[in-house]
Amino acid sequence: MTEAPTESPPEDRTPPREPGDEWVIETLREIKEALKHFDPRLLITLGNYIYARHGDTLEGARGLIRILQRALLLHFRAGCGRSRIGQPRGRNPLSAIPTPRGMR
């Protein structure tokens, strides 16, 4: 039996990447994917809502990612068509966002 090779640093002698780096890269990919399918103003409004609610915290980032994943899943289930959701022709794109309960 041979032993498993020991892990060594990359050839350029940079330190190995942290597991969190992969999470950040995956998150950026999801945001880029959301930008392909949703109006950027809608995503900015969502980001502002999450920021107002959670501030600049990891919990807020997780909440934003969770909402984006759900929205993309529903969007793809409904049949994508690569249109930008929330961007009605000639109207305010933010009017497509339902008013939250308790804010009426």
From Swiss-Prot:
<dbReference type="GO" id="GO:0046718">
    <property type="term" value="P:symbiont entry into host cell"/>
</dbReference>
<comment type="function">
    <text>Stimulates gene expression driven by the HIV-2 LTR. Prevents infected cells from undergoing mitosis and proliferating, by inducing arrest or delay in the G2 phase of the cell cycle. Cell cycle arrest creates a favorable environment for maximizing viral expression and production.</text>
</comment>
<keyword id="KW-1079">Host G2/M cell cycle arrest by virus</keyword>
<keyword id="KW-0805">Transcription regulation</keyword>
<dbReference type="GO" id="GO:0042025">
    <property type="term" value="C:host cell nucleus"/>
</dbReference>
<dbReference type="Pfam" id="PF00522">
    <property type="entry name" value="VPR"/>
</dbReference>
<feature type="region of interest" description="Disordered">
    <location>
        <begin position="84"/>
        <end position="104"/>
    </location>
</feature>
<keyword id="KW-0804">Transcription</keyword>
<keyword id="KW-0597">Phosphoprotein</keyword>
<comment type="subunit">
    <text>Interacts with human UNG.</text>
</comment>
<keyword id="KW-1048">Host nucleus</keyword>
<dbReference type="GO" id="GO:0075732">
    <property type="term" value="P:viral penetration into host nucleus"/>
</dbReference>
<keyword id="KW-1163">Viral penetration into host nucleus</keyword>
<dbReference type="GO" id="GO:0044423">
    <property type="term" value="C:virion component"/>
</dbReference>
<feature type="compositionally biased region" description="Basic and acidic residues">
    <location>
        <begin position="10"/>
        <end position="20"/>
    </location>
</feature>
<keyword id="KW-0010">Activator</keyword>
<keyword id="KW-0014">AIDS</keyword>
<feature type="region of interest" description="Disordered">
    <location>
        <begin position="1"/>
        <end position="21"/>
    </location>
</feature>
<feature type="modified residue" description="Phosphoserine; by host">
    <location>
        <position position="83"/>
    </location>
</feature>
<keyword id="KW-0946">Virion</keyword>
<keyword id="KW-0131">Cell cycle</keyword>
<keyword id="KW-1160">Virus entry into host cell</keyword>
<protein>
    <recommendedName>
        <fullName>Protein Vpr</fullName>
    </recommendedName>
</protein>
<dbReference type="GO" id="GO:0039592">
    <property type="term" value="P:symbiont-mediated arrest of host cell cycle during G2/M transition"/>
</dbReference>
<dbReference type="InterPro" id="IPR000012">
    <property type="entry name" value="RetroV_VpR/X"/>
</dbReference>
<keyword id="KW-0945">Host-virus interaction</keyword>
<dbReference type="GO" id="GO:0043657">
    <property type="term" value="C:host cell"/>
</dbReference>
<keyword id="KW-1121">Modulation of host cell cycle by virus</keyword>
